[in-house]
Amino acid sequence: MAEVEEQGRKLSEESTDESEEEDTEEEPKLKYERLTNGVTEILQKDAASCMTVHDKFLALGTHFGKVFLLDIQGNVTQKFEISSVKINQISLDESGDHVGICSEDGKVQVFGLYTREGFHENFDCPIKVVALHPQFSKSNNKQFVTGGNKLLLYERNWLNRWKTSVLHEGEGNITSVKWRGNLIAWANNVGVKIYDIGSKQRITNVLRDNTSLRPDMYPCSLCWKDNTTLIIGWGCSVKICAVKERDPTEMRDLPSRYVEIVSAFETEFFISGLAPLADQLVTLYYVKENSDHMEEEFRTRPRLDIIQPLPEGCEEISSDALTVRNFQENQCRDYRLEHSEGESLFYIISPKDIVVAKERDQDDHIDWLLEKKKYEEALMAAEISFKNIKRHDVQKIGMAYINHLVEKGDYDTAARKCQKVLGKNMDLWENEVYRFKTIGQLKAISQYLPRGDLRLRPAIYEMILHDFLKTDYEGFATLIREWPGELYNNMAIVQAVNEHLKKDPTNSILLTTLAELYTYDQRYDRALEIYLRLRHKDVYQLIHKHNLFSSIKDKIVLLMDFDKEKAVDMLLDNEDKISMDKVVEELKDRPELLHVYLHKLFKRDHHKGQKYHERQISLYAEFDRPNLLPFLRESMHCPLEKALEICQQRHFVEETVFLLSRMGNCRRALQMIMEELANVDKAIEFAKEQDDRELWEDLISYSIDKPPFITGLLNNIGTHVDPILLIHRIKEGMEIPNLRDSLVKILHDYNLQILLREGCKKILVADSLSLLQRMHRTQKKGVRVDEENICESCHTPILPSDTAQAFGVVVFHCRHMFHKECLPSPGSIPGIQYCNICSAKRRGPGSGILEMKK
């Protein structure tokens, strides 16, 4: 393969100007290789003069009159000694069973390769061309043409004899002929003709354009693209001719077919051969000697171009200058282009060299991409066409890409590509890891190592972790978090981290990572110690997740120091695992923390921690006075004497006032408000809460010689105490601030009270009347009495079985019923006013009597 590629590079040197550098980056469309083996030996002693191509084999004619049959690798399978001079043309039928040969000395031979039948004829002039009928193997198509100074048609008649017909003469030598279907195309010195063998008519004459060129030096090239399309190349001119059926109404004396030139254009170079390639053309050029577009060393090299024909021109698709042997000595007539339609193979024949051009496949495309170091595109192309490529392997291309990236120093991209390229190949993975270690780039490949079902040996991961531990603590910590612990020997890594901690014992990154390693190893106590030491936010999650409450019983202070709120919530939520008494015991030397715990406990449940309420008094007094009074108000288990003692010691007046009032010493409490707080509003509020006339008297007595207090009392006591009592006790001549406003307010409040009382009275009267009327309406209604009702006294049916007899029934408005004789006082009916049952509960409306008798 390397030899072929080398030959291809030598054969496909671009003949473009150096300034057009971008063109050199275009991928060639064709690849080339020399036809070697037997051909090499033949051309060393002889020279190629012509060749024809069949799907099964090749037929090569030489200047020394020999014809060789070759396989497609160039090995000789048969040899024919035809003449001693140049073989001008070889023709094969479609089956490849018969061959026609003509030579410069006038010999023509047509024979079967596998039969004894044949035709041998010697002419007195050189025979330049020969063409067999494409279906020559069939008995009714035994026809061929030869061309020297005239074109002759040979046909075998029914007597098995050859009949000769002259198709054309008088216009010089016949230089080229091509037979396709029923159409024979040939070229002479004047132009190109087409003969329809079916209608026996010549249907066109396409004149040559440049008559100054010698036909023998620049021969015409003919090629059938299909049964109706002929391509003519002559000199620098290309014409594409379409054979069409003529409309019967226009025929008259004209041939049934005609030719239309659908495309015609000039080329820059002389045409030595043509071949179709789909809707494009492959053209073999002999380069003009005076071309300004070619460097001197390339001017005589033949070119093989792919062009796209247009109605009035063409577009060049690709162009390759071919370095054939002895190209400096060759002329335009020395080159030929033959093609194999089935495989798109193109043979460039020169006297000393035969080159095969073929379309490039996906393997060739990948070769070119690799040669241009376009590894990513090559890898993508291989992945897309992995079923079709034969010479390449996706993984090998990927490895070449990785090697290229490493050479460039793009280690991150190289490492990322390892995931895709190396796949599940453990050996390749390990080799790449060691290579990255050698170049000091383990960090680049670390994040792409397999960590799922596919895993490398633990030593590989440990090697990378040790490398990070030496150079990058943060990267090491990241790998520990991201890699599953099963990838490496956890104990070995723990030991390595501990060794580093000996040098840097306070390094938080290493400590945190060590805690994570301990956690994975289920040594939660060790991890918990580190988290608490670091005050790490994950400590509470660790405790909950792994149920480490038994491990924190002696670490409660550490937890509280880290985050009081979270710690207390956790302790209270898990009282079944860490008892309240244990927490209090642990916090006894840290009263500020104990207070936080007991305070939250009290907020959750006022009774759960009742045995600690006495201790909480001093804790509130010391650390949280704002919550002391609410605690005293809400606690039902607080010893009041102890609380009073503490509050008095600390001179907490408000708390002392509350405790005194709760203990029944309201007068002392009021005195403290008046004397120590000197706040008449609070004193009045306190008196209102207690609602005790004696307290009001004490308040008035204390305030009577204090004008500001009198003002406050006048403004606030109107709804609780008759203001006249206060006004009568004010000393004459005492100056009282805002007295007028206070008196106006008193009068206003009094009037408001009167109005409220009158309004309430009216409402009560109206409601009473409404209810009385409703009761009267209700009592006026009849009461249903039937056999289902019973006497509430004797519990027998209220109605007798014989209703014809006289009976008496007493029915009360409460719906209780009695036999008249069952009532306790069998006197006159007016003496029985109330239901015995209802009277025992209460006496009121609804217990009146209704009498029913018959």
Swiss-Prot record:
What compartments host this protein? Endosome membrane; Late endosome membrane; Early endosome membrane; Lysosome membrane
| Source superkingdom | Eukaryota
Give positions of the RING-type zinc fingers: 791-839
Repeat (CHCR) positions are 568-712
Q: Which UniProt keywords apply?
A: Autophagy, Coiled coil, Cytoplasm, Cytoplasmic vesicle, Endosome, Golgi apparatus, Lysosome, Membrane, Metal-binding, Protein transport, Transport, Zinc, Zinc-finger
Main function: Plays a role in vesicle-mediated protein trafficking to lysosomal compartments including the endocytic membrane transport and autophagic pathways. Believed to act as a core component of the putative HOPS and CORVET endosomal tethering complexes.
Q: Which PANTHER family does the record associate with it?
A: VACUOLAR PROTEIN SORTING VPS41, VACUOLAR PROTEIN SORTING-ASSOCIATED PROTEIN 41 HOMOLOG
- In Swiss-Prot or TrEMBL terms, this protein is called Vacuolar protein sorting-associated protein 41 homolog
Q: Which organism is it from?
A: Danio rerio
Source taxonomy: Eukaryota, Metazoa, Chordata, Craniata, Vertebrata
